[in-house]
Amino acid sequence: MGCRMEFSLCVKDLHNFIDKVNYMHSRYTSRFITKTRSVARQSFQYIQGKLLEKGKGNMCSYAKNVPDCDNQSLQHFISDSPWDHWPVLDDIQQDVTRFIGDKKYGAIHVDESCFPKQGRDSVGVKRQHCGRLGKVANCQVGVFLGYNNGPYRTLIDERLYLPEDWIDDKKRRKKCGIPDDVVFKTKVEMAWEMILHAKDNSVPFGWIGIDCFYGRDSWLRNQIDREDMTYIADVPCNIGIWLERPRTGIPPRKEGVRGRNPTREKVIEGTDPIKVRDLKDQLDDGQWNHVFIRDTERRELWSNIATVRVYPSCVDGLPGEECWLIIRQDDNTDQVKYQLSNAPLGTSLRCFAMMSGSRYWIERAFEDGKGIAGLADYQTRSWTGWHHHMTMTILAMLYIMLITIDMGKKAEFLTVQDVKEIFEVIMPKSNITNEEILHLILKKHKRRLSARWSHHRRNK
C-alpha cells in the first residue's frame, strides 16, 4: 500500500455540480406535469431544499434557503398535487440500472425504517415495534428496497405499512386520503411485491439481501427460491435447523383416541431442530475460514466464516429445502451473524463473503437517506404526502450518489457527505469561497489516507 491518492478536483468542477443536478432533473420533469399544471419547478425546489439543508429540515426551512420559493407551494407539491410517484420510482430504477446496475455484483436489499410520530392522525401510525428506538412506540413503518454495487448504494422503492385497524377505519382512511383499492398487506408481502417489481423492471442483481425480520420468514425465502433468485437472509440466533432432513408424513391416529384421522404433515422421525447458535459451538476449527469482507475507511475488514448445509425449520414446523447456513464473526468483535442462503452448491467462500458483507451497504443507504437527504424529516400526515416525500428523498439520494461517482474519478476518497457539504456551499450565496471548500475536501482526503496508512503500518 502506497501513501498516494488521486485528487484533481478544481474550482471548475465545483461549478459543474449545479449543472449536473439541473441536467439530471431535466430528465424527470415530465413526471411532474399533471392534467392541469406543471409542478416541475416545485419538484426541483424541493430537491434544492434537501441539498441545502444543514440539519433537520422542513418545508419552511427549504423555502427560506431556496430562491423564489414559498412554503405553501412546496406544501401543495408534497401533500396535495396529484402527480404520480410510481413512474418516478420506475425511472429511478432505470437510472440505477444504467449507472451502477450489474447482474453479477449488484444486489437488491429488503429492509424497513421506522418513523416515530406523535398522535394518531399521521397515516399508518400505531403503537408498534420501532427499530429506530428499539421498543414499542407510536410510529409509522416504511418498507424499502435498496440497491448496491460495491460501495455505491441507494434506495429504489418504498411502501408504507398500514396496520389492519387502519384498513378498517373508514374515517381515518378518508382523512388521510388512502385510496379505496388499498388493502391490508403484511410487511413481508410488501417486500415480495417490491422484489417482483424490480425484477419486472429489469433491475439486474446477483442476489437479494434480506433483513432479519424478513429473513426469518420461510414464506418469503421460499417465494424467492421458486423464482430462481438467490437470497442471503439475516436470521436470528434461535432459528431452528436440521443437519439431516427428518422424515415427515401424516401420523396415524393414536390407538384408542376418538375423532378424525390426522391430516397435517408433521415430523414423524428424527431429532428436534437445533438452534443455529448451538450449532456454532459444535463446529471444529477446520470448518472456519478467515475471509476478507470489504475495505473500511481505516482498514480492511476480515471475518471468520463457516458455511454448513442445513434444513431450516419453517413456520409450520416442517423442514424447508436444503440451503446454506453462513455463520460469520468479524475480527475484533464478539458479535456473531447468522444468515441463510439458497446459493448454488459450488458457491465460493469469496462469494459468500461478498454477499454477506453487502448487507452493510443498505444500512449505509438508510444513514445517507436520513443524514443527507432528510428521509425522516417530514410533517405531512397524508397518504399522498408520505409517498411524495419518500419518492423525492430517493430521487435526491440518486443525484448525490451519481455525482459522487462522477466526481470520484478525480477524488478517490470522495463521499456522499462531501458532496452534500459542497452543495451547501455552492448553491446558496455563502461566505466561504469555492477555493476554500475545495481545500476542505482535500484536507478530508488527506486525513482518510493518513488513517488508512497508519492502520496499515500498525498491522504489518
Where are these regions (language model features)?
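Conserved, well-structured functional cores that handle cations and Mg-NTP chemistry
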Residues: 2-209, 213-240, 247, 254-277, ...
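Short, solvent-exposed helix-loop connector elements
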Residues: 32-33, 341, 347-356, 371-387, ...
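Hydrophobic, well-ordered secondary-structure elements that form the walls
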Residues: 363, 395
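An anionic, glycine-rich sequence signature occurring as long contiguous blocks
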Residues: 151-180, 236, 241-361, 424, ...
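Generic structural signal for hydrophobic core residues of well-folded globular domains
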Residues: 50-54, 66, 78-81, 343, ...
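Short acidic (Asp/Glu) and glycine-rich catalytic loops that position anionic groups and cofactors
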Residues: 55, 70, 331-336, 343-348, ...
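Conserved nucleotidyltransferase catalytic core and NTase-mimicking acidic/glycine-rich helix/loop elements
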Residues: 401-429
